[in-house]
From Swiss-Prot:
Assembly and binders: Heterodimer of LeuC and LeuD.
Protein purpose: Catalyzes the isomerization between 2-isopropylmalate and 3-isopropylmalate, via the formation of 2-isopropylmaleate.
Listed PANTHER family: 3-ISOPROPYLMALATE DEHYDRATASE SMALL SUBUNIT, 3-ISOPROPYLMALATE DEHYDRATASE SMALL SUBUNIT 2-RELATED-RELATED
GO molecular function (one): 3-isopropylmalate dehydratase activity
Gene name per UniProt: leuD
Organism placement in taxonomy: Bacteria, Pseudomonadati, Pseudomonadota, Gammaproteobacteria, Pseudomonadales
Organism encoding this protein: Pseudomonas putida (strain GB-1)
The keyword Lyase is assigned to this record: yes
Protein name: 3-isopropylmalate dehydratase small subunit
Record bears the keyword Amino-acid biosynthesis: yes
HAMAP family registered for this protein in UniProt: LeuD_type1
Length: 214
């Protein structure tokens, strides 16, 4: 998993509340358990005017020019600004996979759905909760200033605006540790690989009848 320490990136404003996981990555694309291949279909039903299908050539599809991620000024955005209850709906880890592959490193919103919130941390995506007032002000700032960027410092738990104002956010200490060190569930387990091997060796020696090759 990619570590997250500090990131400065262009902000794209998605001014919609209750964005659910089927809107983030529609159900017809959930045909793989690999973590790649979902970015091109992020927000597919909003980015395009037709109904997308797996393995389709998106370059030939009609684009919805009104959707924010299709605006020239937001190309290359890596910070998504959203409204409350982002990531609600059915549980699908493909949602943070799609956001990550598209290029987003962090999502800022007043609140998140619990399962999406947890899945994001496990996939190197940093969800940041700010107050309604802080998010409202950021939407105004982004709209008024093309090329608007934010700097996110996970160690300091701070979001710094271009004008120098710092917005602080809370994060669970364990999740912070994992993100700073790029540790997903597998990475955490591998940290104890020596202890696991020692246990397996002792277990095999003490109960050899449980093992076919003993």
């Amino acid at each position: 998993m990619k570590a997250f320490t500090q990131h400065t990136g262009l902000v794209a404003p998605l001014d919609r509340a209750n964005v659910d996981t089927d809107q983030i990555i529609p159900k017809q694309f959930l045909k793989s358990i690999k973590r790649t291949g979902f970015g091109p279909n992020l927000f597919d039903e909003w980015r395009y005017l037709d109904v997308g299908q797996p393995y389709q050539d998106n370059s030939k599809r009609p684009v919805n020019q009104e959707f924010v991620l299709n605006h020239a000024r937001y190309q290359g955005a890596s910070v998504l600004l959203a409204r409350e209850n982002f990531g609600c709906g059915s549980s699908r880890e493909h949602a943070p996979w799609a956001l990550d592959e598209y290029g987003f490193r962090s999502i800022i919103a007043p609140s998140f759905a619990d399962i999406f919130f947890n899945n994001s941390f496990k996939n190197g995506l940093l969800p940041i909760i700010l107050s309604d007032e802080e998010v409202d002000e950021l939407f105004k700032q982004v709209e008024a200033n093309p090329g608007y960027q934010l700097t996110i410092d996970l160690q300091a738990q701070a979001v710094t605006r271009p004008d120098g104002k710092v917005l602080h956010f809370e994060i669970d200490a364990f999740r912070k540790h994992c993100l700073l060190n790029g540790l997903d569930d597998i990475g955490l387990t591998l940290q104890d690989s020596d202890a696991i091997k020692a246990f397996e060796g002792k277990h095999r020696a003490g109960q050899p009848w449980l093992f076919r090759d003993a």
